From Swiss-Prot:
Catalytic activity: 9,9'-di-cis-zeta-carotene + 2 a quinone = 7,7',9,9'-tetra-cis-lycopene + 2 a quinol
Enzyme class: oxidoreductase
Xref: Gene3D superfamilies: FAD/NAD(P)-binding domain (3.50.50.60)
GO biological-process terms attached to the record: carotene biosynthetic process; carotenoid biosynthetic process
PANTHER family membership: PROTOPORPHYRINOGEN OXIDASE, ZETA-CAROTENE DESATURASE, CHLOROPLASTIC_CHROMOPLASTIC
UniProt pathway: Carotenoid biosynthesis; lycopene biosynthesis
Annotated protein name in UniProt: Zeta-carotene desaturase, chloroplastic/chromoplastic
Single GO term (MF): 9,9'-di-cis-zeta-carotene desaturase activity
EC number in record: 1.3.5.6
Length: 588
């Protein structure tokens, strides 16, 4: 997300303490046996790290073909110079693919740091501030392929194969996918045995899923995906209730999941979005397995990708924003980009390339598209998409908030304790959250300090106008309602980050307006998780869009080089006629 607006609070109180490697012998994930926490505690002997050669879904078989394209053929065309606007995951994915094919790549980013929606930075007190909570499903094969390519496959921590719901009063519900037999039986067992729903709701839930395209996905994944696409014009709630599902199931289970996926609830989310996930969960054993980075995204995700790009000869230009896309119209009416008007503080320059990629978020691409281009339906459709506001809150405590079994353990600071996983809740304004001191310890566990809760407030609309202090006050109160045992623990540091438009709002009927990566403008391409690809708006979707953008560019390499020669000849002709090209461009 190269150009979204974000606002950061000043910490209420500075956190102090020496950073330390997550201690061996720290309590790990708690195992639950009923509506309340059981007395069993699984103690993790060491932080679980895993490479990406195991516990990953095989998306090359029995999966929709568009979700994980085959490796591209070796490019044999002319070497191209490509300018990419935006150093988010989509832009960097595009860059990696193009560099691997031998092209020359420059990435321009208006911010001082890279990563877009998966970016992070360090504040003046040394605290890592993230743009949101990032969780990796086991079916993120395009992203995992990228991480393996750049040498970051050891940077993800595998969590217990269960989805945990924290209800008011500290009551825990689960979708437990740990089962001796894999898909689809592990999923059936998880839904039938969940203690998050009452028996009647579970039965109606099972009926609804049995009547869904998810069943067809077991034998015909591409046909099922087409059926799922055809359901884009109805909300998930409308579809689910029409198949016999209950409102209680939506409120207690599916709304928190929907908020975590797309920052909107089931009443406002397309059935396509939710059913895409369900189909993968049903057919791929590891699709529902969660991973989280072992530390901050800037160090363990964006950092390795940036290094790979630079080692391959790619260049990053930070704080350079694109102010205007310069273009010309040929005699036949076709359009092409002639350059990008860039600026950095008081500096200005025109960037020229053979191909241009706008790897922006929804508000970013809307600002970038020339007004004239909106006469084309392709570009005008983009303006029918809107981003969802989201607020991310970090709270550092002087104890372990999610430790529910042992009050004394929750007060000591020698060892980390609590729930090490992504956590959902139907009973707070933050639908999903995690204790990063447990889940991503390398940067977030600090010796002598406690939990670092990262809470994602969705929908973020009601919180956008509030002061940071008021937001912290409300979130802290809701945390206490979920974890009454945390009474008496104090918040020692906090941060608030507001993003006016994050993921695009995946509401009913919006999928047809998502643009392809190839545009009607001959040398102008798009990338971004909002663009057309078979997954949802996500890290995986962003990575896949980058692969698709690169493929489109390589497929028309000869034409792009011919266009570049044509443009150069026209510019030389203008110069020979005494036209000052630089003056002309400066006036645009």
């Amino acid at each position: 997300m190269a150009t979204s607006s974000a606002y950061l609070s000043c910490p209420a109180t500075s956190a102090t303490g020496k950073k330390h490697v997550f201690p061996n012998g720290s309590p790990g994930f708690l195992v639950f046996g009923g509506t309340r926490l059981s007395n069993r505690l699984v103690t993790r002997k060491s932080v679980i790290r895993a490479d990406l050669d195991s516990m990953v879904s095989d998306m090359s078989t029995n999966a929709p073909k568009g979700l994980f394209p085959p490796e591209p053929e070796h490019y044999r065309g002319p070497k191209l110079k490509v300018a990419i606007i935006g150093a988010g995951l989509a832009g960097m994915s595009t860059a990696v693919e193009l560099l691997d094919q031998g092209h020359e790549v420059d990435i321009y980013e208006s911010r001082t740091f890279i990563g877009g929606k998966v970016g992070s930075f360090v504040d003046r007190r040394g605290n890592h501030i993230e743009m949101g909570l990032h969780v990796f499903f086991g079916c993120y094969n395009n992203l995992f392929r990228l991480l393996k390519k750049v040498g970051a496959e050891k940077n993800l921590l595998v969590k217990e194969h269960t989805h945990t719901f924290v209800n008011k009063g500290g009551e825990i519900g689960e979708l437990d996918f740990r089962f001796p037999v894999g898909a689809p039986l592990h999923g059936i067992n998880a839904f039938l045995s969940t203690n998050q729903l009452k028996i009647y709701d579970k039965a109606r839930n099972a009926v609804a899923l049995a009547l869904s395209p998810v069943v067809r996905a077991l034998v015909d994944p591409d046909g099922a995906l087409q059926q799922i696409r055809d359901l884009d014009n109805v909300s998930f709630s409308e579809w689910f209730l029409s198949k016999g599902g209950t409102r209680a199931s939506i409120q207690r289970m599916w709304d928190p999941v929907a908020y975590a996926l797309g920052f909107i609830d089931c009443d406002n989310m397309s059935a396509r979005c939710m059913l895409t996930i369900f189909a993968l969960f049903a057919t791929k054993t590891e699709a529902s397995l969660l991973r989280m980075l072992k530390g901050s995204p800037d160090v363990y995700l964006s950092g390795p990708i940036k290094k790979y790009i630079m080692d391959k000869g790619g260049r990053f230009h930070l704080r350079w924003g694109c102010r205007e896309v310069l273009y010309e119209t040929s005699s036949d009416g076709s359009m092409y980009v002639s350059g990008l008007a860039m600026s950095k503080a008081t500096q200005k320059k025109i960037v020229k390339a053979d191909a241009y990629v706008a790897a922006c978020d929804v508000p970013g691409i809307k600002r970038l598209v020339p007004q004239k281009w909106r006469e084309l339906e392709f570009f005008d459709n983009i303006y029918k998409l809107v981003g969802v506001p989201v607020v991310t809150v970090q709270l550092r405590y002087n104890g372990w908030v999610t430790e529910l079994q042992d009050l004394e353990r929750s007060r000591q600071l020698k060892r980390a304790a609590g729930l090490d996983n992504l956590l959902y809740t139907p009973d707070a304004d933050f639908s999903c959250f995690a204790d990063l001191a447990l889940a991503s310890p390398d940067d977030y566990y600090i010796e002598g300090q406690g939990s670092l809760l990262q809470c994602v407030l969705t929908p973020g609309d009601p919180y956008m106008p509030l002061s940071n202090d008021e937001i912290i006050k409300r979130v802290t109160k809701q945390v206490l309602a979920l974890f009454p045992s945390s009474q008496g623990l104090e918040v020692t540091w906090s941060s608030v980050l507001k993003i006016g438009q994050s993921l695009y709002r995946e509401g009913p009927g919006k999928d047809p307006f998502r643009p392809d990566q190839k545009t009607p403008v001959e040398n102008f391409f798009l990338a971004g998780s909002y663009t057309k690809q078979d997954y949802i708006d996500s890290m995986e979707g962003a990575t896949l869009s980058g692969r698709q953008a690169s493929a489109y560019i390589c497929n028309v390499g000869e034409q792009l080089m011919a266009l570049r020669k044509k443009i150069t000849a026209a510019e030389l002709n203008d110069i020979s006629k005494g036209v000052s090209l630089s003056d002309e461009l400066s006036l645009v």
